[in-house]
Each structure stands twice: as structure tokens, then as C-alpha cells.
Amino acid sequence: MALAHPPLPSLLSHNAQLRPVAIVTGSSQGIGLAIALRLADDGCDVVINDLPPKLRAMEDAVQCIVSKGARAVAVTADVSREDEVKRLVEAAVEKFGKLDIVRLSFSGC
């Protein structure tokens, strides 16, 4: 995927403890995926989130981010349900030790 803008230089990318951690909802495809990839390029570790039927695409997104040198994890959750949002945040903090950014990118009817 070609980026519209080149990646920003990151002084944090070599120290995992200093890297910002971002959750991007709806990030298995489309705009959400583009946001997640850009955050990884800019030095963030990323939690890929979408609904359970999109798990395979989420795992592909994680592999793409890891290939860029960032850390990533896929966590399924329905962000319309408060209990699942809490579980999503808890999973991010458990995996990376903190949470700095939440970017909502999902659609619904």
C-alpha cells in the first residue's frame, strides 16, 4: 500500500517502552487499516480491532505491522458493547503495558 505521505521520523521506534500504543477500531480493512499502518510507520505499536468474523484479516494486518518493525496484536471486540470495549482496553494494556491513542474507525447501520 503506497502512503500519501512519507513516514515521519521516529526517535521512539527503537525503544519499545517509549513507543506510543494505539488501538484502532475497524482496522481489518479500508480506512481503519490505513490508519493502523500509518501509526505503525510513525512509531506506534498497534492493537488491531474488528468483529470476530474479520479475524483472518486482522491477523494479516498484524503481520504487516510486525514486518514494519512495530509490535501489534489482534483483539476482536464489538465496540457497540461496553463490556467488550473494556476487554479491548484491558487487552491492550496487558500486552503493551499502557494505552496512549484510541482511533475509532468503524461503520454500522
What do these predicted regions represent?
Residues 2-97, 101-109:
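Short-chain dehydrogenase/reductase
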